[in-house]
Amino acid sequence: MINRFSIEKVKGLEIIDSRGNPTIRVFVRTNDGVESFGDAPAGASKGTREAIEVRDENGLTVKRAVDIANYIIDPALHGIDVREQGIIDKILIDIDSTENKSKLGGNTIIATSIAALKTASKALGLEVFKYIAGPRLPKIPIPLLNIINGGLHAGNKLKIQEFIILPIKFNTFKEAFFAAIEVYRNLKGLISERYGKIYTAVGDEGGFSPPLEETREALDLIYTSINNAGYQGKIYMGMDAAASDFYDPKKEKYIIDGKELNPTQLLEFYLDLAKEYPIVYLEDPFEENSFDMFGELQNKLNSTIVTGDDLYTTNIKYLKIGIEKRSTKGVIVKPNQVGTISETFEFTNLARRNSIKLVTSHRSGETEDNFIAEFAVGIESDFIKTGAPARGERTSKYNKLLEIENKFGLEYGGKYFYL
C-alpha cells in the first residue's frame, strides 16, 4: 500500500529575492499530490559561522543549487514520509557531510527543510504554526520594527545597522502594529521636513536612511516620533549594532561616530545611551567572538535584552558557550544560518530551557513567503524581526500575523511582557 505522506518529488527553481538577487525555491510533493515550497532568504550582514550558500558566477545565479535539489536531494528523499522532519533533515546533513553545509549549500538545504515542513502541515490540513506548536496555544510575538537603517543596510555614515521600535504595552497585536505604523509615518514626516523628501525612500528592510552621521541623531528622531504620536511609555526603542561590521581587528577598536573605541569604551557608550533613551533591546553590541563583553554589558543593563545574532548564528555549539558565560538574555533565530528546521528546533529548545528570549528574524534579502511569521508563532517566539511596515516581502509577514490573530484569537505577547 502506498503511503500518501511519502515524498514523490523534490524540485528546485531559481527565483529572485527582494534585492533582485537569485535565490532558490524548493518544492516538495507527496504521493497524494500535496505540494508546498520553501524559499532560501539571504543576509547582507552575515556571521562568519553561518551555513555557506551555493552560488555561481560571482553570486549571480543559483543554478548549481537547483541542480543539487533536482539530482541529489530528490532521489535521496524519495519515499520518505514528509512528516518525519528529523529524518529528512538528517539525510540532508549526512549527504552534505560538512560542518558549514558547503557541499549541498545552506540555501538548498534550508529551502528543502522548510518545504518539507510546509508540505507536511498541508497534508495534515493544519496551519503551519499549529503543526509546529502542537497542542500548545501560542501567543503572537512582539514585533521589532527596523525603521532607520545604517551600517551595511544603508548608504549613510551611521555605523549602527538597525534602529528599532518595540510596541509592547498593548492588548492586541493589531493595536501594537498600527501604533508602530503611526510612529513610522511620523518619522517619515520628520525626515522629509528636515532632510528633504528624497530621504524618505526606503532601504532593503523598509526603513529610512536619512543622511545622519551619529547614533544619537537617529535615536533623537525616533524618540521624537514616538512622543509626537503619543506612545511614550508604550513603544520602546532598540538597536542592532552589528558591531562586527565596524570592528577593526588589527587595532582591536570599534570605529563609530568618528571615534575609535576599545571594548570598555564602547560598553560605556551603550550604558550612556540606555540612560538617555528608553532602550530595551540591544543586538550584537560587540564583535562576534566577544562572549565576555556581551555578558558584562548584559549584567550592567539588567532591564535590557542584550541579544546575540552573529554571536550564535542559530548554532547550538555557540549557544552553549553563551549560556555558560551568561552572555545574553536573548537569541536571534534565523533558520538559514544553521541550515535545517530540526537544528533550529534544537537551538530554540535549549534557549527556552535556559530562560533566554527568542527573537525570530527575517533576512535583508527576503521573498514574499510568510513562513517566518508562522514559524515565529509556532515556536512561541517572544519577538519577531521582519523589517519596517513597508515593502511587500516585509508586510506579507505582518499581514499573516494579523490574519492569525483575527482567525484564531491568539493573545498578544506584549500584553504579558514585563520589562
Curated annotation (Swiss-Prot):
Residues that hold (2R)-2-phosphoglycerate according to the record: Q161, K334, R363, S364, K385
Protein name: Enolase
Major subcellular location class: cytoplasm
Compartment list: Cytoplasm; Secreted; Cell surface
UniProt xrefs under NCBIfam families: eno (TIGR01060)
One cellular-component annotation, GO: cell surface
Name of the gene encoding the protein in the UniProt record: eno
Pathway: Carbohydrate degradation; glycolysis; pyruvate from D-glyceraldehyde 3-phosphate: step 4/5
Family (UniProt): Belongs to the enolase family.
Reactions the enzyme catalyzes: (2R)-2-phosphoglycerate = phosphoenolpyruvate + H2O
Entry EC number(s): 4.2.1.11
Keyword rRNA processing: no
PROSITE patterns xref list: ENOLASE (PS00164)
GO molecular function: magnesium ion binding; phosphopyruvate hydratase activity
One GO-annotated biological process of the protein: glycolytic process
Keyword Aminoacyl-tRNA synthetase set for record: no
